[in-house]
Amino acid sequence: MLEPVTIEALNALGACLADAAGPNPPPAFDTWIDPLPDDADPALAAHIRHQALLRCYQARYVVLPETAPDGDLLERLDRHHGEDRMAALNAARPRLEAELIGPLWDEANAAAGDGDALAYVDRLLPELRAVASDPFLDALAADEHRRDHYRNFLLQSSADLLAEASASALGVIGEFGAPQSALFRILIDEFGYGAHDHKHSVLFRATLRSFGLDDAYNGYSRLFDSNTLMLHNAIHWLFQNPRNVFRQVGFLLFAETAYQRSTLFHARHLGRFHPEAEARYFAEHAHIDLHHTRMVVEEVVRPFLDRFGPGPGREIIAGAELTRAVFARSGAGQLALIRAFAATADAAWGLGPFAGPPVTPA
């Protein structure tokens, strides 16, 4: 059992990251985490630990600024990926994962039941495809501040969607037969089959810009809430650990099927309330994820079970249930925020001094 990261060690990590980033870093190199006071309540402590785990995972990505930064770019890269910085992140990561993601995985594993993956698929797909509406969007439809809330939804979603499929790309590295090729075909769909303007993260950037938001990766990371961080980190725990290969399949099974309905609801919401907004990101997913679910079931789940027997089935189910849990927490958090603002007479709206550039150069 790994011991949790101490407050002293976490604050030392934060100081290391701040030193490497320097003052006023471009978003690509901003790795800020909040300092953790000795008397922090558990919710704040968990939030800051999730911030640190976010930075552990982001450290494995190639992220470059949209325009040349002040100073020497190569020197910036040397600092950002420096040995001391990477060593500190790599030392903290397994402890943070055990503390933050471990309990979520235990709950998902307990929900996996008898491990019959094909029976689970037969239940799951009709269940998700029968979802009639999104409670968050239903609440927005009746709220006069729907644009502000939707901007926050986009801001929070940018944690994953501005680097969409980069996490799952780590799940196709190696050699594991025909299912690997099927997963790669799903991946290259997300990357627009090499046509940059069709890459899903580029489509999402256009949606951000249409709402007047900065579209730089990591641009709003200091505003990510706890549910956003938990969702991001659970997904990256799945895909940044090769041990989780069958659990990753469970994520894809749930996510690709759930997106068929959720993205359709978002496309309809934008068409009704924000017809001027760029909605291609959502319309594209509502269509293509129908094919992705079929590919996951027929070209990944079934071949794995035929090859290895029922053993991987339980992990596939648990991966799907972990995904269900973190998706539900994220959605519930957005809905609770709407209700909290509605109950607060003096709520302030807008980003205020936290706003970045109106639009990052495309």
Indicate residue ranges for each PLM-predicted region:
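Non-heme di-metal
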Residues: M1-A362
